C-alpha cells in the first residue's frame, strides 16, 4: 500500500471515529439543504517526492489533468475568468462558484496572484538567494475579499525552501489549507501544488524534495459516508504513481504546458464514485 493510501484510509477512519459535527455550516447542496460535515482539525502529512512518494490515492480515479489545468489558470494565466478556464482548458466545474453573473469567481486565486505579481517575485528572490526563508505564496487577501463576493481560497498558502544534498539542490514545499473535503478534493489539491513545486524546481534546474501538507479542517460531508465506507473496503493497487514533468532543466516557468506533465504507473481502483458537491 502506498503512503498516500495509508494516510487516506487512516484519516477517513479517524473522521468517522473521532470527528466533530459541524454547526452553522455555510455550504449548501443543490437541493438547498445545508451541507453539514464531520471533521477533524490539524491533519498533517509528509511526502518525500525524491523517493517517489506522491500524494495521490489509488482507491479511486483522481482527475489529475483537469486539476493541473486549474493550477495553470491560477499561476500562469493569473486569471479569475471562467471564460478563460473553459476556452483554454475545457474545465467547467468552477462555474458553480460564479459571482453575480460576472463570469468570474470574484477577486480570488489567480486575480490575487496577478494583483501582487506573486510568481515573478518568488522566482526573483529564489534566483537572488535560494536559501532565503521568505518564499511565501499567500492567497489570503482581506482587501480582495471585501472588494467582491466569492469562495474564499481553500488551499491558500505555500512556502518553499531549498536544501543542498551533496552536489544537488532540492526544493521543498509546505502547503497550508484551511478546509478540505477529503473524499473529493484532498489529492487534487495536493497534486496541484506538487505540480507547482515541480514547475519552480524545473525553472532553476533543481530536484524536487519533500512536500508537507497541513489541513486545518479535514472533513467528510454528511451525504458521503457510504462512499467513505466503500473506500475503506477497497484494496489499493501495489504500484506507486509518479508525476513526471517532461521538460529540460532550466525551462522557464511560463513556458511549461499542462501536457508536459505525465502521471505514470497510475491504475486506480474502479468504478469511480459519485459525489454531490457542497457549494
Curated annotation (Swiss-Prot):
Function: Catalyzes the reductive methylation of 2'-deoxyuridine-5'-monophosphate (dUMP) to 2'-deoxythymidine-5'-monophosphate (dTMP) while utilizing 5,10-methylenetetrahydrofolate (mTHF) as the methyl donor and reductant in the reaction, yielding dihydrofolate (DHF) as a by-product. This enzymatic reaction provides an intracellular de novo source of dTMP, an essential precursor for DNA biosynthesis.
Keyword Methyltransferase: yes
InterPro entries cross-referenced by the UniProt entry: Thymidate_synth/dCMP_Mease, Thymidate_synth/dCMP_Mease_dom, Thymidate_synth/dCMP_Mease_sf, Thymidylate_synthase, Thymidylate_synthase_AS
Pfam family, one: Thymidylat_synt
PANTHER family (UniProt xref): THYMIDYLATE SYNTHASE 1
Transmembrane segments: none
Entry GO MF terms: thymidylate synthase activity
Originating species: Streptococcus pyogenes serotype M5 (strain Manfredo)
Pathway(s) annotated for this protein in UniProt: Pyrimidine metabolism; dTTP biosynthesis
Designated gene of the protein: thyA
Protein residues bound to (6R)-5,10-methylene-5,6,7,8-tetrahydrofolate: 181, 278
Name of the protein: Thymidylate synthase
One Gene Ontology cellular component annotation held by this UniProt entry: cytosol
Amino acid at each position: 500500500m502506498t503512503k498516500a493510501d495509508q494516510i487516506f484510509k487512516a484519516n477517513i477512519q479517524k473522521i468517522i471515529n473521532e470527528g466533530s459535527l459541524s454547526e452553522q455550516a455555510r455550504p449548501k447542496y443543490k437541493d438547498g439543504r445545508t451541507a453539514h460535515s464531520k471533521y477533524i482539525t490539524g491533519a498533517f502529512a509528509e511526502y518525500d517526492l525524491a523517493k517517489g512518494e506522491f500524494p495521490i490515492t489509488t482507491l479511486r480515479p483522481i482527475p489529475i489533468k483537469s486539476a493541473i489545468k486549474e493550477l495553470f489558470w491560477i499561476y500562469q494565466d493569473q486569471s479569475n475568468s471562467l471564460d478563460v478556464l473553459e476556452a483554454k482548458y475545457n474545465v467547467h466545474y468552477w462555474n458553480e462558484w460564479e459571482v453575480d453573473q460576472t463570469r468570474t469567481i470574484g477577486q480570488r486565486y489567480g486575480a490575487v496572484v496577478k494583483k501582487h505579481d506573486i510568481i515573478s517575485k518568488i522566482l526573483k528572490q529564489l534566483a537572488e538567494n535560494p536559501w532565503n526563508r521568505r518564499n511565501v505564496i499567500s492567497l489570503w487577501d482581506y482587501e480582495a475579499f471585501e472588494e467582491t463576493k466569492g469562495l474564499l481560497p481553500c488551499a491558500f498558502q505555500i512556502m518553499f525552501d531549498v536544501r543542498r544534498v551533496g552536489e544537488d539542490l532540492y526544493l521543498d514545499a509546505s502547503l497550508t489549507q484551511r478546509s478540505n473535503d477529503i473524499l473529493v478534493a484532498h489529492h487534487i489539491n495536493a497534486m496541484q501544488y506538487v505540480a507547482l513545486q515541480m514547475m519552480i524546481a524545473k525553472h532553476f534546474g533543481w530536484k524536487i524534495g519533500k512536500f508537507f501538507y497541513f489541513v486545518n479542517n479535514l472533513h467528510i460531508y454528511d451525504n458521503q459516508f457510504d462512499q467513505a465506507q466503500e473506500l475503506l473496503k477497497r484494496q489499493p493497487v501495489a504500484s506507486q504513481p509518479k508525476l513526471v514533468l517532461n521538460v529540460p532543466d532550466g525551462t522557464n516557468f511560463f513556458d511549461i504546458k499542462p501536457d508536459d506533465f505525465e502521471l505514470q504507473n497510475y491504475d486506480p481502483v474502479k468504478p469511480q464514485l459519485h459525489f454531490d458537491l457542497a457549494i
